[in-house]
Regions:
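Extended ligand-binding clefts on enzyme/binding-domain cores
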Residues: 37-118, 132-133, 149, 156, ...
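Extracytoplasmic Gram-positive cell-surface binding/anchoring modules and repeats
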Residues: 127-128
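Non-membrane alpha-helical segments in proteins
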Residues: 134-144, 249-253
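Sec-dependent signal peptide recognition
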Residues: 2-7
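Cysteine-centered motifs
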Residues: 10-12
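C-terminal segment of classical bacterial N-terminal signal peptides
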Residues: 14-21
């Protein structure tokens, strides 16, 4: 009987003329309910058992000075409460954003300026989306806070990622051949989209619907259809991009949760379940990333098949399916450096150290010796890799200090490199008051917009610099702390009290285009990433390191 039922369901699926749903968008003709039932009824995803083995920690001498600071767990309960409050009632995954009901009409109208189609997509993402980077920040905050309830919540995203589906979205893992994402052109099947091929699956899509919806409704006016919407007029989830940087943070979060759960600091070992979800997921995503590692040592932004609408000037060098594959992001690689470091520290496997050395090689390639800063990235053109000079990226500079540490930067690029890097970054993106006090930093070459999240990353960098210079240059240490203090005070301009028990921080100080493919939001749009990073700053917790 089961075989007959299976055949009937397969006929139904074929009759529905399923398109390639994993290019830019999907279509409402696809029936995710049928496919979910079919996939999991006949081939459920196994979860690891709970037997334990000891695993010694690999001694990694990358950070002679130790953690940023003693973790003081100075977590504002209003912020932590908000993180745990702003979750889907259906899946219990966190939302990336929050907008108070009174602010929604104006905020949503501003998004309409991009056109009804793009406005609808942006509103849907803001209303019910979860960027997996934001989800990682949520996981790390909860693991840092500790306690069984928080650890259970922190573990939940990894359970979904390992399962490979969320609600009606039957597959959140990008590979081949169910969808046509190719990591290795010589062996497309090397990274799979078959969610039953554990350990061989591809990246997670960067933004997923936290409610698990495939079909969506425009939150501004309740519309369910728009003429000309991609693939089908019926509104549906459209963001299917498996981007390297977001997946690095999925690994970082998994390793932070794993470290919190299983590390015995007294014995210096991990007492872990055989094949814990966190470690298995981290290994699997790292495998896909290493396959994307180019001859420069840098990890490509995404596999072949990741869609991008091209600008006119890009059409001669790229097509819609290879733009992401032929670009490398320095920010993405800094994140992967931290992810590989954590995996090497825990497992001691040399392949992760080798991957780190590759990224180190890439970072030397994109170091602008003249300005003493990192280029945003690189791209493949005319048979060779070329550095991307078009746009300055503030987060690359701050995160390099956070992740690599001032001591390593000085060792790699010369004495004083870390300090000069910060001074240059502040010159490009600092926002100042009339007295010259530093209010925050923006995204690129600008002095009139503050990113709360990127400012928090800069404050973390200043903490690292102050500690590094404390015993060798007290003047630099004082300057770093002064900049940090000035920015921290300024951040309260974008701190919103939602209720007596809930508070959160804005995404940014104003709406505007960011030259890296997205928009900053009105200050009324509260952000999981901003709020989480402010918690990191106040707690003295650097998420790039296992502490």
């Amino acid at each position: 009987m089961k075989k007959i039922l299976l055949v009937l369901i397969c006929i139904c699926l074929l009759a529905s003329q399923i398109p390639n749903v994993w290019a830019q968008t999907s279509t409402s003709k696809f029936n995710p309910y049928l496919f979910n039932w079919l996939k999991f009824s006949f081939n459920p995803i196994p979860f690891p058992n709970n037997s334990y083995i000891p695993l010694k920690v690999k001694s990694v001498v990358f950070r002679p000075q130790g953690p940023t600071a003693a973790i003081n767990h100075n977590i504002d309960p209003h912020l932590l409460n908000w993180l745990k409050f702003n979750v889907s009632p259906i899946t219990h995954l966190p939302y990336s954003f929050y907008i108070a009901d009174k602010d929604k009409p104006a905020v949503y109208r501003h998004m309409e300026a991009a056109g009804s189609l793009q406005g609808s997509i942006e509103r849907t993402i803001t209303h019910e989306g979860m960027d997996i980077y934001d989800g990682a920040v949520y996981q790390i905050v909860l693991s840092m806070a500790g306690g069984q309830e928080n650890l259970n919540k922190a573990s939940l995203p990894d359970q979904y990622y390992w399962q490979g589906s969320v609600g009606d979205t039957w597959n959140i893992r990008a590979g081949y051949p169910i969808n046509t994402f190719v990591y290795d052109p010589k062996d497309p099947d090397r990274v799979s989209s078959d969610i039953s091929r554990l350990g061989e699956r591809g990246f997670i899509f960067r933004i997923i619907d936290a409610d698990g919806n495939y079909l969506v409704t425009d939150p501004m006016d309740g519309k369910k259809s728009i003429a000309g919407f991609p693939d089908n007029d019926r509104l549906h989830w459209t963001d299917w991009k498996p981007v390297a940087g977001e997946n690095a943070w999925a690994v970082i979060a998994a390793m932070q949760v794993y470290h919190k759960k299983y590390f015995d600091s007294a014995k210096g070992v991990y007492a872990r379940p055989l094949g814990s979800v966190e470690l298995q997921l981290a290994r699997e995503l790292a495998r896909a990333a290493m396959i994307l590692q180019s001859e420069t040592g840098g990890i490509r932004m995404a596999p072949l098949g990741t869609y991008r609408g091209l600008k006119k000037e890009e059409e001669k060098d790229f097509n819609e399916n290879n733009w992401w594959y032929d670009h490398i992001s320095t920010e993405n690689n800094i994140s992967w450096y931290a992810a590989f470091r954590m995996l090497y520290q825990v497992t001691g496997e040399d392949k992760y150290k080798k991957a780190m050395e590759g990224i180190k090689k890439y970072l030397r390639f994109v170091w602008d010796e003249k300005q003493g800063m990192f280029y945003q990235g690189a791209f493949y053109k005319g048979g060779q890799w070329v550095v991307a000079r078009e746009n300055f990226a503030l987060d690359v500079q701050a995160w390099s200090i956070d992740c690599l540490g001032p001591e390593n930067l000085d060792a790699w690029f010369g004495k004083g490199a870390a300090w000069a890097l910060w001074q240059g970054a502040k010159g490009h993106s600092g926002v100042f008051d009339k007295q010259g006090g530093l209010l925050g930093v923006g995204y690129t070459d600008e002095h009139d917009r503050v990113s709360v999240e990127w400012s928090a990353g800069a404050m973390m960098a200043l903490t690292e610099l102050a500690k590094y210079y404390k015993n060798q240059d007290s003047q630099k240490a004082r300057e770093a702390l002064a900049d940090r203090s000035s920015m921290r005070k300024s951040m309260e301009n974008w701190h919103y009290k939602i209720s007596q028990s809930l508070g959160a921080y804005s995404y940014s100080s104003r709406r505007g285009e960011i030259p890296f493919g997205w928009n900053s939001h009105d200050p009324e749009v509260l952000s999981l990433a901003s709020t989480g990073w402010m918690i990191f700053v106040d707690a003295g917790f650097n998420p790039f390191w296992l502490i």
